[in-house]
Amino acid sequence: MYKVQYLVLFLSVLLLLTMYVGCETKASDVKEMTKTRALVVENTTREVLEIYAKKKLSSTDLLLLENLNKDLDKNTDLNKKAEIARKLSAKWYDLGYPAIAGAYAEMLAEWFPTPEAWSIAGTTFGQAIPQKEDAKVRDFAAAHAVTAFENAISLAPEDWTNKLNLALVLTEVPPQDNPMKGVKMLLDLDANYPDNARILFHLGRLAIQTGQFEKAVVRLEKSLKLDNNQPQIYCLLERAYRETSISDLADKAAEKCRNSIK
């Protein structure tokens, strides 16, 4: 989990479109929703998340976590504390609680603020965002992921991967006062990095989500041409080809899609 990687999120663009082109929302209502979300995030902490998560854990896992937390509290050497925090982050991640794992990764980044440390924290938080069944956890993770990626960008502004990951988070959980912010960031990234396979991949997926299938074909084909080691792209291409009535290419993409998930 500590290898810096591209954050892969399944964009909930239907929600974004509902907010953007649906019924007109009064500015006061938007401000109130934004205030409510901020309050929820403020009242949600790692400690609160741990209380609820521990109710579902085995006695063995509880004992291990308790001992690690005791070691974390009693140690004064920052390097030793960092090693314990890494173990706690890894354990919570393995248990299926990426938001809590992200909080410990965030702790590490605060102690040793490097671009990589903040990127790891943001990526870890990002893994909790698709957990839509718990809005509090999702909003908590998204808010902390945004902060982590912004910190990473401030330390390494030339690194486009953190900018991409930030855009993906903002597309997945759009700010209520600026729902198109993530999409605009993706388009800006494409303008600044026109031959970037990963950016084109996500723009192609976004185009499919929004029904712009011809645009999706162009973006995904260009992405694949730039990087042919993207097995997951064929599943998207199949859909784009089908919707644009390119049946022969859709069939070929479908076969490659099936092979990629075997």
Mark where each language-model region is.
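Residue at a conserved register position within TPR or TPR-like alpha-solenoid repeats
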Residues: 92, 124-125, 170, 207, ...
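Residue-level recognition of tetratricopeptide repeat
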Residues: 114-115, 159, 193-196, 213, ...
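N-terminal leader/linker segments that initiate helical-solenoid repeat arrays
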Residues: 2-99
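TPR alpha-solenoid repeat register
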Residues: 84, 117-118, 162, 199, ...
